[in-house]
C-alpha cells in the first residue's frame, strides 16, 4: 500500500509539473481566485469544531479526483501525516553517493506531537529512563483544564499518559513545552487517571529536575539511517525486539553482536539495565533498515545501574567513540 501511495504521489507531482508548464496562466488565475475566496471567507469558519470536518470540493478529471481522495483520507491519520512528510526527508539531509545513507536531521516525535519549546536551561537533556520532576497541565482541545500536578516519575513508565513522557524527552531543566497528544497516545499505567481515547489533548509541561545527571549530548552523537522513514516512530515506553552490534572504531573490534549469539534483544525503551544510548537511539526510530550511531563509550553505560545487560562497565572504553548498529526491528505489544 505504501509503495502504491508513493507511486501515485510521484505520478501526481510529475503530472502537475507538466500541467504547470503547459497552462501557466490557468494556474495563476486559479491561485488568484483561491486567494480572493480565502480573503472573503467569514472568520466564523475558523471557529468550527475540529470534529466537524468541512466537505472538500474536488475538481479535475477522474484520475485527479481519485488521487486527491486517497491523499485526503491518508492525511486524516497520524500515520498518513508522518508518511507524507517523510517522503521529502532526503531533501533535508546530505546523501552519501556511495551507500545512500541519510544523516538524520528530522525529529519525527516533535512532528507527531506538534511540540513547541519555550525558555532555556543548562541541565539535560532528559532521555528515556531518566527520573524527572515536572509540573504539567492537561486540557481538552477547547482549553478546558482537565488535570494539573507536580509529579516525579521515570520517563517510559507512563504514569499520566504515554504521550507526556515523549514530549518531555529532550528537554532541559527550566524549559517549558506545549504539545498536542493524539488520542492513541493517551494510554497510561495508572488506575487513577483515565482519558477518553477518542480525543486529542493539549499539554503544557515544565521540567524541574532530572536524575541521574548522566546525559547524551546531541552534538557529540551522529545518527544515520540507511532507509527512508515512512511510518510512525517508536516511542519511549514501548517494547521492541531488535538486533544490536557494537564496534570499537579505533581497531574495528566487535564488542557485542546479538546476531552472532543467535538471539534478538527484547527491550522496553527506557529500561535502565540497558545502555543509555540504546534508549536514545531507539526513541523516534521507525522500524525499517539499520540505524547507525556513533557515540562516546560513556554513553554505553546503563543509566543509574551497575547492571548492564549488554556489556560490562569495566570493559567499556569510555573515552573512545563506538559504533552502534541497530536493525531487524519488531514492536512487541
UniProtKB/Swiss-Prot annotation:
Residue ranges of every copy of the PPIase FKBP-type domain listed in the record: 129-227
Keyword check for Nucleus: no
Residue ranges of the region described as Disordered: 29-51
Pfam families, per the entry: FKBP_C
First-tier enzyme category under EC: isomerase
Keyword annotations: Isomerase, Rotamase
One GO MF term attached to the UniProt entry: peptidyl-prolyl cis-trans isomerase activity
This enzyme's EC code(s): 5.2.1.8
Reactions catalysed, as given in the entry: [protein]-peptidylproline (omega=180) = [protein]-peptidylproline (omega=0)
Disulfide bonds: none
Origin superkingdom: Bacteria
One BP annotation, GO: protein folding
Protein name: Putative peptidyl-prolyl cis-trans isomerase RP395
Amino acid at each position: 500500500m505504501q509503495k502504491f501511495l508513493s507511486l501515485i504521489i510521484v505520478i501526481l507531482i510529475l503530472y502537475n509539473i507538466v500541467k504547470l508548464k503547459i497552462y501557466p496562466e490557468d494556474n495563476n488565475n486559479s491561485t488568484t481566485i483561491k486567494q480572493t475566496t480565502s480573503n472573503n471567507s467569514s472568520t466564523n469558519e475558523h471557529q468550527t469544531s475540529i470534529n466537524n470536518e468541512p466537505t472538500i470540493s474536488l475538481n479535475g478529471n477522474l484520475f485527479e479526483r481519485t488521487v486527491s481522495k486517497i491523499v485526503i483520507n491518508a492525511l486524516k491519520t497520524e500515520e498518513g501525516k508522518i508518511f507524507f512528510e517523510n517522503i521529502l526527508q532526503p531533501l533535508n539531509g546530505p546523501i552519501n553517493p556511495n551507500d545512500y545513507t541519510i544523516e538524520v536531521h528530522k525529529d519525527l516525535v516533535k512532528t507527531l506531537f506538534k511540540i513547541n519549546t519555550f525558555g532555556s536551561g543548562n541541565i539535560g537533556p532528559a532521555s528515556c529512563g531518566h527520573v524527572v520532576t515536572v509540573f504539567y497541565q492537561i486540557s481538552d482541545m477547547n482549553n478546558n483544564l482537565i488535570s494539573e500536578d507536580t509529579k516525579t516519575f521515570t520517563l517510559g513508565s507512563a504514569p499520566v499518559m504515554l504521550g507526556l513522557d515523549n514530549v518531555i524527552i529532550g528537554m532541559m531543566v527550566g524549559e517549558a513545552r506545549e504539545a498536542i497528544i493524539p488520542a492513541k497516545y493517551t494510554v497510561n499505567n495508572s488506575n487513577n487517571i483515565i482519558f477518553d481515547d477518542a480525543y486529542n489533548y493539549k499539554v503544557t509541561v515544565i521540567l524541574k529536575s532530572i536524575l541521574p545527571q548522566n546525559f547524551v549530548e546531541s552534538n557529540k552523537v551522529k545518527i544515520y539511517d540507511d532507509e527512508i522513514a515512512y511510518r510512525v516512530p517508536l516511542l519511549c515506553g514501548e517494547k521492541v525486539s531488535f538486533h544490536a552490534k557494537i564496534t570499537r572504531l579505533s581497531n574495528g573490534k566487535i564488542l557485542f553482536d546479538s546476531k552472532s549469539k543467535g538471539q534478538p534483544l527484547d527491550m522496553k525503551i527506557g529500561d535502565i539495565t540497558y545502555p543509555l544510548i540504546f534508549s536514545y537511539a531507539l526513541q523516534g526510530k521507525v522500524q525499517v533498515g539499520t540505524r547507525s550511531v556513533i557515540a562516546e563509550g560513556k554513553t554505553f553505560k546503563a543509566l543509574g545501574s551497575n547492571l548492564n545487560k549488554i556489556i560490562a562497565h569495566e570493559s567499556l572504553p569510555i573515552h573512545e567513540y563506538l559504533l552502534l548498529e541497530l536493525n531487524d526491528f519488531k514492536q512487541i505489544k
